[in-house]
């Protein structure tokens, strides 16, 4: 991510004498080639939250470093620094990051032939060219009247007209106005941290401001502008927007910038100045330019990008250079977060964080296109378009997500899927569950009104509920967190659906869950991922470094929901998975095979093969390890486990899982082991309970041959339970 950090270095100059110790001393005293290597190291190769690492990068990119590459305005080499272009060529050849390689080659070409020394030139560097384009964009935004953040007055007028003819849209608009009414007269926000987060306050502030500002634009009633102003002034009076937790700043920046812009004509000159000055202080001139988000590839980048982009558009007529610097930074950093979805669209942090990060991402792009006429090519980044179908692929017939990593099982409504359907004509992205969830919001039945609802309304429409495409029966998404889905028929709600996870536990928000799966049959979820933990409670119990460290000895892996023991995968030799490993997924005919060997160093080879038929699903594990090694197979379920066998009726079934009026059979695991029922509850009271959950467990030992094969088949054949008995169905076929 060298290019990303170079951008941020050009935003400001700080005097930071280097503390010569540890990684800092090693980096600043190293040859230039090593400095470049250090700057381009991805986050996962360093300790997350390491302030020494962050400060080192700041110094290497700052004017105190003789190799400082860019001047603050991005126009060329600064401080008389010299850099060997051959070092950039080496970095371009060795890095696995295609975007980084392209930047290195471009800069090397600008410097001259490989091996030549640095030279000054009037030719713009790639970074300076991007900065020049940002200056032009801000200049264009300055000419636009308010409102200009995300939508103009003409856009609001068009939305009113469209709502008159679109029942779904009208229901959404009406609900947004009712929600704005509910906020009237309530106390405004107060500063208060939850642990080290201000996020709860930020989100409620965004919800109130954006709903009120939207209601003002749609009705013209000044009571809504007055309410938005009261909340904005309360937030602007905060001592800070909590730069320690950067997404707090990002959400607050988007909220206040949108509210300021959409209610601009109702604000007094004094109120305009108060809000604009606070936005400049808390967003544009705060710690954001040097915060750790610039070196990340996750939802933080997307949230901060949306907030800062909205702020630069809202304040374009104040400080053009300051706004352009931020805009150029976003245009270079955001592709790093988008590209993680490549090549096939998988979001590494799971569908819950996709919903969060991508919603802010697409808001950011629409803000850019409305104000500048383009989005700096951000919508063309490889993986960005492909990820539009990701939530639909992760949604089983039960309506629940494959909620790996820190995701919750409930899908709810997603802003971004409506954007993909509207902007990129991906109507298959809008599932029946998404439409139902949006209608629940409109009917006032949802637990909470989405704070992004006013933005969604510019995309939603009845025309998008008529899906024109179909989802694939089998799909493998490769990349940094491989995911696969196998189903016999995505159009049949009763058909088996199985999704499995590969990748590494060490990724941001990752769990030790390689090989873990979820299973839907009869339109119900039978095998569950327990989902996310409560960050605040866990941090209070084991510390932030304990929760967020990905190291093998981290306390993170002892938390039930995060460690191997709480997932639908294997424990081998009494041990969980090594977070330094990486599980791959490959296709084998209609099946998918997960190579789990690198996450289980206690075994020679481990693989899991999953497949589905029309009426059944199968999981086959092959473990090669020392004879006598114990293997524990586990699956979280909320079903009742029925141990009574009826060999004549069900010759291939060893036990049954039942709930409601449904029942599925489970075969013996063919490994010479023992089935049992275990607890799915954590040992500590500071961990989230898992009500109604239990674990179906199979324990076996590796035989003398050193090779254990466990085959578990789930079947709906002759196993559906009705009050009057069993309904016999046709034989399964593969």
What does each of the following model-derived ranges do?
Residues 13-70, 74-88, 94-166:
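Mature N-terminal, pre-catalytic/accessory segment of carbohydrate-active enzymes
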Residues 146-163, 169-400, 407-408:
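Aromatic-lined, polymer-binding surfaces characteristic
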